[in-house]
Amino acid sequence: MPTQQTVTAPSLENRLITLQHNSSVLANNPLGDPSQRPVNVYLPKAYYDRRRKNRRFAVLYSLAGFTGAGPGQLNWKGFEENLVERLERLITSKQMAPTIVVFPDCFTAFGGT
């Protein structure tokens, strides 16, 4: 008889926050696309290290492909890492420097970004 195993998602050691951006460019646009957009931002654990207040970080803007949206890049994946999990692994294993990653929602009524 097979044994039952408990599977838990990896813990998110770093931070993922959501900001709201009000775009004056999209205000009153003819397609009726919302001008207020969520912007997810990944902040590495080192960002909160108070001993290094003046530290600077590289910033990457992760733009989703056509018909994709920023929030979709954060989705759970059953058999592989999502983007945040990959960032966690690469930063923790020192294969990547601590980096801020911005995931803007650029989806439009045309279905693209």
Q: Where do the model's predicted regions map?
A:
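Non-catalytic cap/lid and distal C-terminal segments of serine-dependent acyl enzymes
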Residues: M1-T113
